[in-house]
């Protein structure tokens, strides 16, 4: 990200998309990180977090809107990377503003023989789960420089969202396996979905 910011006029801006100054491009990027975290953190602290279906649906909708919006501001490559920066920033903030502080609070309460707040443990667990399921998508985005046919595809934002869903399904299989629950059908589903997506991209490539 530092390299992109340092060469923002070349690596971030695509005048065919939007004619931005280097300063404006950096400002938009940093603003997207802050706003995305505030929105995500607010949702996690709301009652929506108690309804997995509504929470996941809202997060997927926001992922789609953010991905689409970024492709209308930055060049395709940095737009892709920006989604990874946003998710990575949220993961980092989860660890240092929620997970670690809450765990330290619980430890301190235990040392003082005080009853600790169970909501702190639950919040830390939820954020940890979010980070866990985001891992594969972030890794994919980190390597996206090798997939120019995806990065510069007309529907790159939609492809990214679909890969996010597929990668989360794959991650779910490995999470279950870590608990000695073997559900190969989940892994097969993610693999088949990935093959179907790849086939569609190949057929309808730019």
Task: Annotate the PLM regions.
Residues 1-205:
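Polytopic transmembrane helical bundles with strong interfacial aromatic enrichment
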């Amino acid at each position: 990200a530092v390299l992109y910011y340092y060469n923002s006029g070349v690596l971030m801006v695509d005048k065919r998309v939007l004619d931005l100054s280097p300063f404006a491009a950096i400002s938009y990027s940093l603003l997207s990180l802050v706003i995305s975290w505030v929105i995500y953190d607010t949702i996690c602290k709301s009652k929506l977090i108690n309804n997995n279906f509504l929470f996941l649906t809202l997060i997927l909708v926001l992922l789609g809107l953010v991905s689409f919006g970024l492709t209308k501001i930055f060049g395709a490559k940095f737009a892709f990377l920006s989604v990874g920066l946003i998710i990575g920033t949220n993961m980092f903030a989860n660890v240092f503003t929620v997970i670690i502080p809450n765990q330290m609070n619980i430890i301190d309460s235990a040392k003082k023989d005080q009853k600790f707040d169970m909501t702190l443990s639950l919040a830390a667990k939820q954020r940890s789960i979010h980070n866990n399921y985001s891992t594969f998508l972030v890794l994919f985005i980190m390597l996206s420089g090798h997939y120019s046919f995806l990065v510069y595809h007309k529907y790159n934002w939609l492809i990214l969202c679909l890969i996010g869903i597929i990668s989360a399904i794959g991650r779910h299989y490995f999470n279950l396996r870590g608990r000695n629950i073997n559900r190969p059908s989940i892994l097969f589903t993610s693999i088949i979905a990935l093959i179907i997506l790849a086939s569609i991209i190949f057929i309808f490539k730019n």
